């Protein structure tokens, strides 16, 4: 066997007849498969053992030789070689065809390669190949032309007239002769001459022909090889025949197709031997041609050949195509051993890096490891007895299993795996039962819940795989989300609620104003019931041992609550004491206002002394009473602080991660989780009907709205307003009423209302849910998406009327249907994104580019889409950043901007920063470390070998399911119906003409005139320096310019989305890149999804990496061809070096589907879409796949060239010295 890891590249080409014969182990002469009595393969048939090898290991057909000792012997009786049966997976046969046949891919594909090289139309070709017309091969001394078609009648007439002075024939034979006469060199020369003068369609045709001719010339393929003389027969194990239970046989469709070919071929041979009349022979040849067509690509021409039940048979092409084809089913995704799946349940007592594995599953997964250990410990004598012990579940087995799984991580995966956090590593702990236990905090990353979700377990076997799982994939390592660099393991639901409840403050709660001298006293007081969790107390600051407190503060008292003392115990030691949910408190220190000296003033002392109870106290009691009195006064001046909501908990995690990195963060997360569960249980927060309080003055609000609506209806009836205006006003009246109800409800709600607490903390629900429960449901849309003007006035608490209930069903059904459609759409988008960017890998440290990207805050009009600091964090600067006023250097050139630097830049009032960006990176086949910047998933600089393309694709695709599906048509004014959500993202990435397209100016100048041609149709005239242009605005479009405005090239004249292809024509590439980036961010930010700019940059760069050659100059490039920017630059550099004229080009934008198919790698393109077209093209060009991307390597079974699979990480050797061990790189 060849070692896949030794491959440099993979080449595809046309096979010559000799090549096909050299692959073959013998000719298949009979259509028989197996003998019906003996069930053994027939000799010379499709399963013949003599050709393809024995069906049983080390055993010949007749049974003369059995056993390994005869390895390699060829039996003298049956002629079968004694070898392993698996050679039947690789040995091929062949069929010698009695007449040449054309290969349907090259004749029928679009464009027809055969037609282009012969300069014949596909229709003419079809007539010749299928024996409808004759073609003139050699005109001789006649007035006929070469390649002229003749009907049967004409042919006879010419034969009578000219005799044998000309040559004409039909069928693939004739085409073969024509192909054989082509001189590629001459053809190239004449086509290049033609290009110099040709225009229009002739030029296009010449370019296409030149491309095909050049392909043949450069690849060394001969055009004659498109016609088959010999047909290869694939190995029998790849088209198996298996016996079913009932004694019948199931067989692959290919066997049927091969049988038809052999039958027709044998019949043709017999007819030729008999010297049958030409009309019979021609018919048989046509049938043979059709049989071979069906075998190669059934259904490509004419009606497909069908099997039983009118099902079209699956041909060789179908074996490769589609989701069930060879590429996607077997090469890009295989089923693996050492795996299992089960239902998941919550494991609240697990550590962050652990999962619970059911015992019976673990014993099966780790069987070989346990067997080895049993033998090594002497508990079993050999592997066989060890296996028996395991099957009987002997007691020794469990102890051994415990030891085996210790330190052996397993991978857990949940489908759908939308991003890389969908598969993570855990250390298994054995649990009873049959369900996998999952840590609650990793649920967000997996998008898992415990309503019956299942997960798969995989065991990494080799030491390297285990090391990678532990170091790179352990759940405790994956704290940040790769899409935005924010923590993905934020607590949710119960944990949020518990911590919210714990950090609540209440005025005059039990024991308010108590003074404590240490956290232990606080806990004792809480346990004995003297104080409540929400009680405001004072504690001696020094007793908290917080290093952020100053010496002076340590001698003072800290105003806080019992709950906050408990909460702060989970934070790392050197962290500030968090007393209020503010960034200042979190990132710097506890605010000064919470530290107090409890020295009493005269006035308060007098008040106390007038109280007889105070005077009866002893000295210590008096001091305490004085302090409590002072404390109460302080509490009056310090307002009640908000509790910690979900977002703030997320900020705490991010800050801990920033300061202490992974280990400390995961420990803190576990403590936060435990606290949350414990106190949400203590809180006992539940929902009852009594918690939903209906608004008393709801009736009045609705009556006012109804009155407004009645007025509008009256105006409409009198003809004062149009139908559209009436509808809009009705809708806005009811919307306003609902908003008013919502606002009043929120005001009237008590802060202790359980439903309010759930929604306020961020655990579950929001204001709108509450409005529907207690206020009114509001307006609903009908199935067409138009809003019904009859609102649902009832709330769920009051109950809906029958009509209201019916109206509600539209929305509910639409919601479910949309969700189902959205999931599929979003998955397909992710697949296309992954495909286009799968070869973008960080390849080098610095590409040395001299360009950068100047960015400011992303704005849409006056609305902020993304702030500057968010955009620059984790990027390298292109220029040194200097404070505009003080002149002090904030960050040197090429420095990495972190959170603190970004803050300094904002505070300095700098509005634009020039950064390194993927847009301007010069690295071939990827990006460099400097242009990419920080890896958002780790918060460190990105490593060489990181597959940033795939991470980008997942980051954009994964939130796709959260985007809305279609536009809601509110009716009314045009221009509201611009596409949003998922369809808009697809529109951008596929570079389609957008819906609601805006008009852009192609020249710079002044708007000289705006005239209305007809109602709703306007024409804009722009007066430039050289020319004047007129633009028609789409019907009813809103204009963005007025007369007298100055416009620039590429400026928008009407509202709507710009067509990027048009923008690219009038502006440069960087404008288009920035426009696409902004548009994508706009869609995601509107849905509240944050994605790092760099991910979108990587994708957009892939869309704009090709150029179209306009003039070839003196280079070998073909005009009109698509090339990678790097290839174009290289070709031009070579031409200039030799003193020749360089070529010219223009940039093109390709949609992601098109860009994937235009990739250099044919394996990657073929496994994506349009398999046959890609392979046809690649074969003619004799393409080499350099195996640079990930897909190509997965397909041929190599390690992917990313991460630890990269060459530079694989060539490492460790040399052991006597004294010390030093790692030496063998690069």
UniProtKB/Swiss-Prot annotation:
Pfam families reported in the protein's UniProt record: RNA_pol_Rpb1_1, RNA_pol_Rpb1_2, RNA_pol_Rpb1_3, RNA_pol_Rpb1_4, RNA_pol_Rpb1_5
Q: Which SUPFAM superfamilies does the entry mention?
A: beta and beta-prime subunits of DNA dependent RNA-polymerase
> Which cofactors does this gene product need?
Mg(2+); Zn(2+)
> Could you confirm whether the keyword Magnesium appears in this record?
yes
Q: Write down the InterPro entries for this protein, in alphabetical order.
A: DNA-dir_RpoC_beta_prime, DNA-dir_RpoC_beta_prime_bact, RNA_pol_asu, RNA_pol_N, RNA_pol_Rpb1_1, RNA_pol_Rpb1_3, RNA_pol_Rpb1_3_sf, RNA_pol_Rpb1_4
Q: Which residues bind Zn(2+) 1?
A: 60, 62, 75, 78
From the UniProt record, list the reaction(s) this protein catalyses: RNA(n) + a ribonucleoside 5'-triphosphate = RNA(n+1) + diphosphate
Instruction: Recite the UniProt keywords alphabetically.
Output: DNA-directed RNA polymerase, Magnesium, Metal-binding, Nucleotidyltransferase, Transcription, Transferase, Zinc
Please provide the Gene Ontology terms (biological process) for this protein: DNA-templated transcription
GO CC, sorted alphabetically, is: DNA-directed RNA polymerase complex
Q: Which residues form a coiled coil?
A: none
Domain of life, per UniProt, equals Bacteria
Record family assignment: Belongs to the RNA polymerase beta' chain family.
According to its UniProt entry, the function of this protein is described as: DNA-dependent RNA polymerase catalyzes the transcription of DNA into RNA using the four ribonucleoside triphosphates as substrates.
Partners and quaternary state? The RNAP catalytic core consists of 2 alpha, 1 beta, 1 beta' and 1 omega subunit. When a sigma factor is associated with the core the holoenzyme is formed, which can initiate transcription.
Q: What is this protein called?
A: DNA-directed RNA polymerase subunit beta'
Organism whose genome encodes this protein: Lysinibacillus sphaericus (strain C3-41)
